[in-house]
A protein has these predicted regions:
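Conserved, well-structured ligand/cofactor-binding cores
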Residues: 1-220
């Protein structure tokens, strides 16, 4: 993270903390429940637990595991999003995601089960579980409990602060990662297709006149 990104993250978190100093003004999903429970107040001693429960309750993915290269892209895109300083997360949470990315600690995410209402909720919940010492990660080619890997590396689980569960789960990093991956491969395939086509034309002793610029200018 750059110094500017760190400053933005800290500044946004401080702003949120100031807004929460007024208990008379409820803030959706922070001092209230979610969805139909939006009129239920949440006490200050339960704010962290609310966010942790949000992550755990949405970690309901099924199917095959998401490939490792896609998970790395998910982490990168989530880090980029949070680094803009608009999400209200604590700096430690973003730094831990950066550490996961740099050390190759890849959360186990599943391909099916996303709710999709506010983004890729289920996949991003699975991405977030290892921050709490929950779920599984792929580390050095092995799938292991995240708590075990964190302990091995001397890392303590993150204690989510108010709003952090929302910030981690809301977003489109899962589908965006697949989109980026597909675009990269499409560009490579496009280049290969040109080379393969040229070699095939040469192998069959084809004529190159149909490819001249002048021909296509006339046809246009």
């Amino acid at each position: 993270l750059s110094d500017d990104a760190r400053a933005r993250i800290v500044r946004c978190r401080e702003y949120l903390d100031r807004k929460m100093e007024n208990p008379e003004r409820p803030i959706y999903g922070i001092t209230t429940g979610f969805g139909s429970l939006c009129d239920i107040s949440v006490g200050s001693d339960e704010l962290s637990r609310l966010q942790q429960n949000l992550v755990m309750s949405h970690a309901c993915g099924t199917g095959e595991r998401v490939p490792s290269e896609i998970v790395r892209l998910i982490l990168l895109l989530k880090i980029q999003s949070l680094a803009y300083g608009h999400s209200g997360v604590q700096l430690a949470t973003v730094e831990r995601l950066v550490e996961f990315f740099n050390r190759g600690i890849l959360p186990v995410v599943y391909q099916q089960g996303s709710l999709g209402a506010s983004g890729d909720l289920a996949p991003l919940a699975h991405m977030s579980l290892p921050l709490l010492g929950l779920g599984e990660v792929e580390y050095k080619g092995e799938v292991r409990p995240s708590a075990e890997v964190l302990a091995e590396l001397g890392l303590e689980p993150i204690r989510l602060q108010s709003k952090e569960g929302l910030a981690l789960l809301n977003g489109t990093q899962f589908m965006s990662a697949y989109g980026v991956w597909s675009l990269i491969h499409a560009r490579r395939l496009s280049e290969w297709a040109d080379h393969i086509g040229a070699l095939s034309l040469d192998a069959f002793d084809g004529r190159i006149e149909p490819f001249c610029d002048e021909v296509h200018l006339i046809r246009a």
